[in-house]
Amino acid sequence: MEPVDPRLEPWKHPGSQPKTACTNCYCKKCCFHCQVCFTKKALGISYGRKKRRQRRRAHQDSQNHQASLSKQPSSQTRGDPTGPKEPKKEVEREAETDPLD
């Protein structure tokens, strides 16, 4: 075995680096490729800065869509007490006219 330079960090010793380069693949083989791959891929630990997600800007199409929605006639208000009473009466009449077996 060759003597190792004591000034080198243990992870920079010859033979400590894998022969193949690290990839972006997340398969089991690539997750256990080296210690760096294991911490980043398998454990999900990343010490880098988190990227900010950009907000999606509203396009003109979506503004037109909003305008068309406001032009549509609105349905009955929820608090209107006069609306649903008539159909109930019809159902009651049908139940009275149809005798059970």
From Swiss-Prot:
| Residues at the site labelled Essential for Tat translocation through the endosomal membrane | W11
Segments for region (Interaction with human CREBBP): 1-24
What does the PTM comment state? Asymmetrical arginine methylation by host PRMT6 seems to diminish the transactivation capacity of Tat and affects the interaction with host CCNT1.
Which Gene Ontology CC terms are recorded? Answer: extracellular region; host cell cytoplasm; host cell nucleolus
Predominant localisation class: host cell
Gene Ontology MF term list = actinin binding; cyclin binding; metal ion binding; protein domain specific binding; protein serine/threonine phosphatase inhibitor activity; RNA-binding transcription regulator activity; trans-activation response element binding
The ranges of region (Disordered) come to 47-101
Q: Which residues carry this modification: Asymmetric dimethylarginine?
A: R52, R53
Q: Where is this cross-link: Glycyl lysine isopeptide (Lys-Gly) (interchain with G-Cter in ubiquitin)?
A: K71
Which residues does the annotated region (Interaction with the host capping enzyme RNGTT) include? 49-86
Binding residues for Zn(2+) 2: C25, C27, C30
**Parts forming coiled coils:** none
Keywords carried by this UniProt record:
Acetylation, Activator, AIDS, Apoptosis, Host cytoplasm, Host nucleus, Host-virus interaction, Inhibition of host innate immune response by virus, Inhibition of host interferon signaling pathway by virus, Interferon antiviral system evasion, Isopeptide bond, Metal-binding, Methylation, Modulation of host chromatin by virus, Modulation of host PP1 activity by virus, Phosphoprotein, RNA-binding, Secreted, Transcription, Transcription regulation, Ubl conjugation, Viral immunoevasion, Zinc
Which biological process annotations from GO are given for this protein? Answer: DNA-templated transcription; positive regulation of transcription elongation by RNA polymerase II; positive regulation of viral transcription; symbiont-mediated perturbation of host chromatin organization; symbiont-mediated suppression of host innate immune response; symbiont-mediated suppression of host translation initiation; symbiont-mediated suppression of host type I interferon-mediated signaling pathway
What protein family does this chain belong to? Belongs to the lentiviruses Tat family.
Q: Explain the purpose of this protein.
A: Transcriptional activator that increases RNA Pol II processivity, thereby increasing the level of full-length viral transcripts. Recognizes a hairpin structure at the 5'-LTR of the nascent viral mRNAs referred to as the transactivation responsive RNA element (TAR) and recruits the cyclin T1-CDK9 complex (P-TEFb complex) that will in turn hyperphosphorylate the RNA polymerase II to allow efficient elongation. The CDK9 component of P-TEFb and other Tat-activated kinases hyperphosphorylate the C-terminus of RNA Pol II that becomes stabilized and much more processive.
Q: How does it assemble?
A: Interacts with host CCNT1. Associates with the P-TEFb complex composed at least of Tat, P-TEFb (CDK9 and CCNT1), TAR RNA, RNA Pol II. Recruits the HATs CREBBP, TAF1/TFIID, EP300, PCAF and GCN5L2. Interacts with host KAT5/Tip60; this interaction targets the latter to degradation. Interacts with the host deacetylase SIRT1. Interacts with host capping enzyme RNGTT; this interaction stimulates RNGTT. Binds to host KDR, and to the host integrins ITGAV/ITGB3 and ITGA5/ITGB1. Interacts with host KPNB1/importin beta-1 without previous binding to KPNA1/importin alpha-1. Interacts with EIF2AK2.
HAMAP family per UniProt: HIV_TAT
What does UniProt say about this protein's domains?
The cell attachment site mediates the interaction with ITGAV/ITGB3 and ITGA5/ITGB1 integrins, leading to vascular cell migration and invasion. This interaction also provides endothelial cells with the adhesion signal they require to grow in response to mitogens.
Name-wise, this protein is: Protein Tat
Query: Which gene specifies this protein's sequence?
Result: tat
